[in-house]
Regions:
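Short glycine/serine/threonine-biased micro-segments
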Residues: 2, 22, 65-68, 123-124, ...
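Phosphate/oxyanion-binding loops and surfaces in catalytic or ligand/nucleic-acid-binding neighborhoods
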Residues: 14-17, 68-72, 146-149
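A structural signal for well-ordered alpha-helical segments within the folded catalytic domains
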Residues: 5-9, 113-117, 137-141
Length: 158
């Protein structure tokens, strides 16, 4: 799973817990034999998370987090372009017209350079690793369960 790892990681981070089961659909590219379109439902003890991602559809990237009193939308959250600021829209949910939306802007940055710098500092003993090996293993268990579900057509446990 290519970009599906990002919404899975983010969902686990937001909920602060692991999903108990997942169901997924995956379409593979017939030439490259890689996943090109994936959708999944992750069933967490606190509620569901859903995502759809693709490597071969129109360029569009958003993450939306819905709560009972509002929502947050992040524009281009996972590979922000080097020439465009990232915007976060915070909606207090006062109406369906979005009159309660406040926009926060994150300045231009190179996420991959920062990631490389943080990793290098950790390797040199100058900082902590921001994500543990255990977290990576837990994320991989969810990804593998989505693949199993796509093959079985049933809910699977990570």
């Amino acid at each position: 799973m290519d970009i599906g790892c990002y919404p899975i990681t983010t969902s686990r981070f937001i909920f602060g817990e692991e999903p108990t089961r997942v169901v997924g659909l995956i379409e593979n590219d017939p030439d490259f034999k890689t996943d090109r379109l994936a959708s999944a439902i992750l069933d967490f003890p606190s509620g569901p998370a859903t995502f759809t991602c693709s490597t071969q559809m129109v360029h569009y990237q958003r993450m939306q987090i819905f709560g009972t009193k509002g929502r947050i939308e992040i524009e281009i959250p996972f590979n922000a372009p080097l020439d465009k600021e990232t915007r976060i829209f915070i909606d207090d949910g006062r109406d369906v017209h979005g009159s309660g939306i406040v926009t926060e802007t994150i300045p231009l940055t190179n996420q991959y350079t920062i990631q490389g710098d943080v990793f290098s500092r950790a390797v040199l003993g100058l900082g902590d690793v921001p994500v543990s090996i255990e977290d990576g293993i837990a994320n991989m268990a969810v990804i593998e369960a989505v693949f199993r579900s796509a093959n079985s057509g049933a809910w699977e446990r990570p």
